[in-house]
Amino acid sequence: ALACPEGARAIDPFTTHRFLMALEASGSTGKGSGWLARPLTLRDGVPVGAMPLYVKSHSQGEYIFDHGWAQGYERAGGSYYPKLQVAVPFTPATGRRFLCAPELRSALLDAAISLTEQNKLSSLHITFCTEDEAEALAGRHGLLHRITQQFHWENRGYATFTDFLNDLSSRKRKMIRKERETAQGRGLTIRALTGDQIEPAHWDTFWQFYQDTGSRKWGTPYLTRAFFTEIHRTMRNDVLLVLAFDGARAVAGALNFIGRDTLFGRYWGCSEDHPCLHFELCYYQAIDWAIA
């Protein structure tokens, strides 16, 4: 019922102990971050359920924007923060938030609500849960169901990237082929790395890419450098790192996390601008890898 045995391929890499601990051990969450971990566990002699739960002192890093709610709550005389958040920090990826059998969800929800009330927190929020969880919990204990949008690519039985292209209109096929030719025709070498193919030095380079992206408009680099060291140590087999090299020097990269049947694209950055390289590394290389 829990995420998975350590070392096994998780359905969702973001709710594994190793991912959440990488955030905490690296200082990306914890004291001073506005994300204070308060995980819930459910036991029946042995662990039978868990929930990633955080006391939040702000709304940053959630990718669900409730600042208007916070302002309205405080204009009415209340204090919106701290609040209680069921979520994976900095990760707007849909996945299970109730790590238990369906019949045990209500026990975890009751415990989270009790924690909210006992600590006089303003509210309880559950973000990016599965559709099944949302439907099962809507209306329970006054929970309001809010729907947002995401874009997911699905493999409809494709054996090759060409099969995928053949499923598109002629205009879109030509556009993607042209973009790939542009990105791949500039003398760069593109490598998709996972597991022991990833070297510690690759993270030094990717950290610079991550910082560059975070420094741009609307960007916020929530992760610390130590986070990348932690995931290299504990979950590099769950990572696909796509890098573009100019000779021996990496000039751009995209970081993906590998689930049991899903590839999750998360971060991108570069030290040089090259036409169409963002699309190549973040989308087309990832789709290629997922199909293979």
Where are these regions (language model features)?
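Short, amphipathic alpha-helical segments
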Residues: 88, 92, 102-106, 110, ...
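Conserved acyl-donor/pantetheine-binding loop and adjacent beta-alpha core of acyl/acetyltransferases
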Residues: 54-97
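Conserved acetyl-CoA-binding loop-helix of GNAT-fold acetyltransferases
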Residues: 102-114, 274-288
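Short, intrinsically disordered, charge-balanced linker/junction segments flanking boundaries
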Residues: 1-2, 42, 90, 285-292
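Noncatalytic linker/hinge segments flanking ATPase motor cores
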Residues: 77-84, 89-95, 165-169, 192-196, ...
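A short, internal acetyl-CoA/4′-phosphopantetheine-binding micro-motif in the GNAT/acyltransferase core
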Residues: 91-104, 268-276
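A conserved beta-strand-loop-helix scaffold within acyl/acetyltransferase catalytic domains
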Residues: 1-72, 113-117, 122-275
